[in-house]
């Protein structure tokens, strides 16, 4: 880790990535904290986890948060052992000139972000460059979706996901073997979310009328892989309130679950990681 302005006690060297590896430039303290949390959660689940940082063009559409963004913002992805990839949006840039999409090991990112006591408390300590070791682009499992074009299916109470996780953990205690959670449990479709047809989305009828309008609308079938990933990455509270939502969206072969603290993505055509 180094401070590009020689502030905050993290070192004095400045510039782009070192010749021997990749670097990330962190633009605010919140991003430094969130990057460290994401990396440590990923490593806790899988010691071989990867982090992928893909820059967002300035002013690019973003249906997660806002209609436009400043420069220096990226999607930060993390692999999980369940198959879906986790994602947060942060004020981070790939450090090497000309690169807008880099992959590094999550344990390297965890090491250079330190713990909460080493994070500076003011944005005067940033931008800061983090040396993250060798590139791991060839190890990334599959692709990640491009921004835009998502269809929101519906919102589901976060408590539903925590309940599904708790019940599945109970089953897993009895059925798990030396290879971890059984594939049959992970692949099980546990929740079907149906949305209204676009022309009917503004309606608020209940009962049979609402059910009829949902016929022909977007559908998302959620598996335990997504439930475990969303919960294990801490993207929803452990004890959510009754009105805490998880937004479910679809785009072609992709599904996305948006929790308060981050999102998980899964593709029906994307190979899953072994447990």
Language-model-detected regions and their locations in the chain:
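Generic structural motif recognizing short loop/turn segments at the entrances and edges of beta-strands
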Residues: 19-22, 47-51, 70-74, 85-88, ...
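Short, low-complexity, polar/charged sequence segments that are solvent-exposed and flexible
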Residues: 44-45, 94-97, 274-275
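Long, compositionally biased intrinsically disordered terminal regions
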Residues: 112-275
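N-terminal ordered "arm"
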Residues: 1-91
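Intrinsic disorder/low-complexity detector
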Residues: 5-6, 102, 109, 202, ...
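A short, sequence-level motif marking secondary-structure junctions
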Residues: 81-82, 92-94, 269-273
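A broadly used, surface-exposed interaction patch
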Residues: 85-124
């Amino acid at each position: 880790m180094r401070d590009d302005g020689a502030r905050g006690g993290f070192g004095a060297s400045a510039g782009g990535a070192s010749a021997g590896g990749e670097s990330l430039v962190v633009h605010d303290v919140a991003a430094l904290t969130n990057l460290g949390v994401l990396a440590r959660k990923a490593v806790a689940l899988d010691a071989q986890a990867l982090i992928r940082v893909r820059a967002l063009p300035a002013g690019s559409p973003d249906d997660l948060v806002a209609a436009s963004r400043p420069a220096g913002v990226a999607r930060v992805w993390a692999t999980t052992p369940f198959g879906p990839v986790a994602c947060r949006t942060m004020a981070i840039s790939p450090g090497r000139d000309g690169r807008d999409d880099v992959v590094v090991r999550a344990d390297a990112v965890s090491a250079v972000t330190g713990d909460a006591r080493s994070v500076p408390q003011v944005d005067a300590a940033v931008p800061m460059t983090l040396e993250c070791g060798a590139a791991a682009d060839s190890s990334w499992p599959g692709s990640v979706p491009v921004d835009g074009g998502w269809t929101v299916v519906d919102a589901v109470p976060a408590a539903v996901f925590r309940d599904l996780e708790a019940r599945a953990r109970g089953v897993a205690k009895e059925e798990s073997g030396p290879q971890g959670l059984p594939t049959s449990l992970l692949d099980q479709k546990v929740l079907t979310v149906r949305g209204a047809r676009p022309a009917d989305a503004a309606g608020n009828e209940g009962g049979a009328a609402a059910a009829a309008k949902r016929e022909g609308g977007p559908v998302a079938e959620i598996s335990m892989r997504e439930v475990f990933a969303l919960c294990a990455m801490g993207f929803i509270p452990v004890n959510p309130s009754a009105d805490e939502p998880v937004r479910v969206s679809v785009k072609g072969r992709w599904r996305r679950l948006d929790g308060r603290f981050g999102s998980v993505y899964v593709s029906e055509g994307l190979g899953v990681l072994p447990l």
